[in-house]
Curated annotation (Swiss-Prot):
One annotated GO molecular function: RNA binding
Keyword Aminoacyl-tRNA synthetase included in the entry's annotation: no
Glycosylation sites noted in the Swiss-Prot or TrEMBL record: 67, 73
Protein name: Ribonuclease T2
Reactions this protein catalyses: a ribonucleotidyl-ribonucleotide-RNA + H2O = a 3'-end 3'-phospho-ribonucleotide-RNA + a 5'-end dephospho-ribonucleoside-RNA + H(+)
Keyword Coiled coil part of the UniProt annotation: no
Length: 240
């Protein structure tokens, strides 16, 4: 009986301490997500001349649409709009703020549970800061991984990023349809903790975020998912 009582007390203390460390619903990881515009437009049947990786989003690992009454207001980020248009463009509607509105409502309102991200300006500003800090364009170029008709191994891409930042990224591709032998590089995720320190992107049991990219098959191909180590990677060049 004493043992049972002790076990109950111990469990209660453990749960309380865990809740104090990570309050229920609080995120523990941010996923900085960059996508390759050429691959996106292959999936969405659009045309783009962006020749560099652009921001897709900054996503907490738990929660979506945490405060739907907190509406996006572009005037609050007016000073960083030129940078947003350049590095976080809406590839489908370049002159529209719809994409930023969507990202704020779905992910920004959840990121805002942290004091360091508790405003539109803090959230979008931090995403831009991290985008420049973890510069995929420079890292891949430095390792001779450039958009072209040649193929790379997934290990080439992973090693380039891991050697630069010391953590393993999550790399996603458009997979070929039946009989296809080449996957298309589409999206790369780099993760940080609540203090914006790098951490691995391995998915944990508490993660509830999901990929925002469409998963509609294109030309017999599957949607975007984690790249396959056994298959060559195609990094498509800008289409003239």
């Amino acid at each position: 009986m004493r043992f049972i009582a002790f076990a109950v007390i111990f469990s209660a203390v453990y749960l309380c301490s865990s809740a104090f460390t990570h309050p229920r619903g609080e995120w523990t990881k941010l996923i900085l997500t960059q996508h390759w515009p050429q691959t996106f437009c292959k999936m969405e049947h659009c045309k783009t001349d962006f020749s560099y990786w652009t921001l897709h989003g900054l996503w907490p690992n738990t929660g979506v649409r945490c405060n739907t009454s907190w509406h996006f207001n572009a005037s609050l980020i007016e000073d960083i709009l030129p940078e947003m248009e350049k590095f976080w463009p809406d590839l489908l509607e370049p002159s529209s703020p719809k994409f930023w509105n969507y990202e704020w409502t779905k992910h920004g309102t959840c990121a805002a549970k942290s004091e360091s991200l508790n405003s539109e300006h803090k959230y979008f500003g931090k995403a831009l800061e991290l985008y420049h800090k973890f510069d995929l364009n420079s890292v891949l170029l430095k390792n001779q991984i450039v958009p072209s008709e040649k193929h790379y191994t997934l290990e080439d891409v992973e090693e380039a990023i891991t050697s630069a930042y010391g953590v393993k990224p999550k790399i996603q591709c458009v997979h070929p349809g039946q009989g296809g032998q080449v996957q298309i590089l589409g999206q790369i995720e780099i993760c940080v903790d609540r203090d914006f320190q790098l951490m691995g992107c391995e998915k944990s049991s508490e993660d509830t975020w999901s990929n925002d990219l469409p998963t509609v098959p294109v030309s017999g191909q599957s949607g975007l998912s984690v790249c396959d180590h056994s298959m060559p990677v195609y990094y498509p060049p800008v289409q003239a």
